[in-house]
Amino acid sequence: CSNLSTCVLSAYWRNLNNFHRFSGMGFGPETP
């Protein structure tokens, strides 16, 4: 990662996506 904040946000959104997906809800932008 070249930008730390972008990396943190990417990891944050991935975790949030996984949590909501586990709850049966899709949320947040898709991050690679």
From Swiss-Prot:
Record GO terms (molecular function): hormone activity
Cysteine-cysteine disulfides: 1-7
Subcellular location: Secreted
Sites of Proline amide modification: 32
Main location: secreted
GO cellular component annotations of the record: extracellular region
Keywords: Amidation, Disulfide bond, Hormone, Secreted
Family membership noted in the UniProt record: Belongs to the calcitonin family.
Function of the molecule: Calcitonin is a peptide hormone that causes a rapid but short-lived drop in the level of calcium and phosphate in blood by promoting the incorporation of those ions in the bones. Calcitonin function is mediated by the calcitonin receptor/CALCR and the CALCR-RAMP2 (AMYR2) receptor complex.
Annotated protein name in UniProt: Calcitonin
Organism (species): Sus scrofa (Pig)
